[in-house]
Amino acid sequence: MASTYSFDVVSDFDRQELVNTLDQVRRDVGNRYDLKDSNTEIDLEETELVITTASDMTLQAVEDVLRTKATKRNLSLKIFDFQTPETAGGNRVRQVVKLRKGLSQEIAKKLSKMVRDELKKVTVAIQGESVRITGKSKDDLQAAIQLVKGKEDELDVPLQFENYR
């Protein structure tokens, strides 16, 4: 039997679910009467989405469709960081949507401090873009998971728990 148990807190999303969501959004935009002739393009790059469309109003509608479809596919809306729209050539509007992945040092430190202040029986270590929480009993780790889930709204990133051992 192991003398210590641990798990990792990470911020990640399923890229394939995002691709499927964007396919649904493109299909929905192509079928909707008010968006059909807007010539909307949604491009997925490595760390961001680029939405190019005809006007601010259609951009808002496309954002709404994106949020709805992402929610239906169990993607957290916290992965989307909507930047300010900018004008593109030919009376078009472009918006960059950055995709949040991984815990920044600032968020990892905040999470680490939060767990250390509340639970004295666990140790917290920041490991790159994840936070490892270690404890002698599984009950302590369950308490840490409940604490982090309860405080997740204070953080700007979605959290997942991996490598529970």
UniProtKB/Swiss-Prot annotation:
SUPFAM superfamilies: YajQ-like (SSF89963)
Entry keyword Nucleotide-binding: yes
Pfam family, one: DUF520
Keywords: Nucleotide-binding
The keyword Cytoplasm belongs to this UniProt entry's keyword annotation: no
InterPro entries attached to this UniProt entry: DUF520, UPF0234-like_C, UPF0234_N, YajQ-like_sf
One Gene Ontology molecular-function label: nucleotide binding
Stated role: Nucleotide-binding protein.
Family of the protein in this entry: Belongs to the YajQ family.
UniProt-recorded name of the protein: Nucleotide-binding protein Syncc9605_0652
Taxonomic source organism: Synechococcus sp. (strain CC9605)
